[in-house]
Amino acid sequence: MNIFISNLNFRVRKEDLIALFQNYGEITGARIIVDKETRRSKGYGFVEMSEEDGMKAIAALNGTEHQGRIINVAVGQEREPKAL
């Protein structure tokens, strides 16, 4: 399951997401989205884990404080490929 996390502190790293979500199950992937030009965080990211564990994590973490900000945690949506 793909989990979308928004309103992240701009200093949050991939390792921070892993530490936050690992209490809910095995993580198969994590990434912070960064600006292509500046390489600065855009304040959101994704975590991959099983559907059962992901639903537990969403229920437990959505609306909680992490590094000074209230985070939003939800099921991630698949994006349509960009047209060439």
Where is each model-derived feature located?
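Intrinsically disordered, low-complexity RNA-binding regions enriched in Gly/Arg/Ser/Tyr
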Residues: 1-23, 28-40, 44, 48-84
